[in-house]
Amino acid sequence: MKFKTLKASEYCDSVRDGTHDSPKKVEKGYKLITSKNIKEYGLDLENASDISEEDYKKVNERSLVEKNDVLYSMIGTIGLIHRVNYEPNYAIKNIGLFKIKNEQKSKWLYYYLKTPKMKNYINSLLAGSTQQYITLNNLRELPIQIPEDIEDTNKIIHILELLENKITYNTHTNNNLLAA
């Protein structure tokens, strides 16, 4: 199997990050997702802050999250990843945003960023002593290896999806048993 390497900025439609501002919290509004809301297998929307519709629209002018985008925690806990496989209605703060319209490309990036090879590579790029972070420029420059044959890509994605679905199911089952 042959691979080619592209920078994330070449592979994705664009690479951005969420707002750096701190929108005022409101009692009921739109969710504002930060790194602490990205979990191993999903988003914790329940503990996300609510922001006003005005702030939501302002944040989304710069960093609108759409279906097939990949979110990446880039401050504090680095490397938690979420692939958006639905139409979202939240805004993001200090989160890497890999914008990808193509579903298969989105899935490949999601799984590729989870590999030990990429995690080690990203760890070598971290800055900051008190609170570590990875820069937006470093995210744009990430080398993404992709099979040259799209059929190889599809086969790999299929296998990884089956494994992840099984892991997710087992994790939920274990959590339910612990809660009982």
PLM ranges: what are they?
Residues T5-K24, K36-K67:
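Sequence-specific dsDNA recognition surfaces
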Residues K107-R140:
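Short, positively charged
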Residues G29, N47, I92-N94:
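A generic structural signal for short beta-strands and their flanking turns/coil linkers
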Residues T34-S35, I51-P116:
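A short beta-sheet element
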Residues M1-G18, E141-A180:
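Non-catalytic DNA-recognition/assembly elements of restriction-modification systems
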Residues M1-K4, K31, P88-N89, Y111, ...:
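Residues that recognize and position ribonucleotide moieties
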Residues M74, N89-G96, G128-I157:
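A short glycine-rich beta-alpha junction/loop motif
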